[in-house]
C-alpha cells in the first residue's frame, strides 16, 4: 500500500493549498498504483491542477480518470467534466478557438445531463451559463431557453438557492430589455426584488424602464 502513503501526503499538502507540491506526490501515487485499482488518485490530481487554473492538464487527467472507470462513470462525473470545460473556456489562458471548443464540449455534456435527468435543474442551469458565455452580449439570447427551464425547476424547490434564481431572472430581465419588451423585463426585475428587496441591479433596471 505504498500508494496510500503517497496519496495521503499529497492530500495533506493540498489541504494546505500547496497544490504544486501535492501534484508531485499524487503523480508518484499514480505510478505506485500499478494495478490501476484506484482511479480516484487521477481525479484528485486533476483537481489539484484545476486549483492552479491549469485547465488543459486538469481536463487531460480527468479524461484519463473517466477511461479508468471503464464505462462506470456516474452522471456526476460527467457533470464535473462539463464544469471543467466551462472553467477552461473562461480562463485567461484560452484563446478564442480554444474557448469555442471548450464551450461546445461543455454544452454537449450539459445537454446530455438535462436529457438524462430532466427533473434536475443543474443540466439546464450550466447549459445556460455556457451559452451565456458564448453569447456574452446576450444579443442572440442563446441562454434564454435554458435559464427558463432551470428557473421553472428552481421555483418548485422549497430550498432553492436565491442566488441561482436571481441569476436566471437577471438574465431574462436583461434579455427582454434588449428586445424592448419592457413590460416582460419588469416582471423579472420585480421578481428579484421580491426575493432580495435591496438588489441594486434590479432597482437600477426598474428606474431605467
Protein language model features and the residues they cover:
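Alpha-solenoid helical repeat scaffolds
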Residues: 1-179, 204-209
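Eukaryotic acidic, Ser/Thr-rich intrinsically disordered low-complexity regions
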Residues: 192-193, 199-209
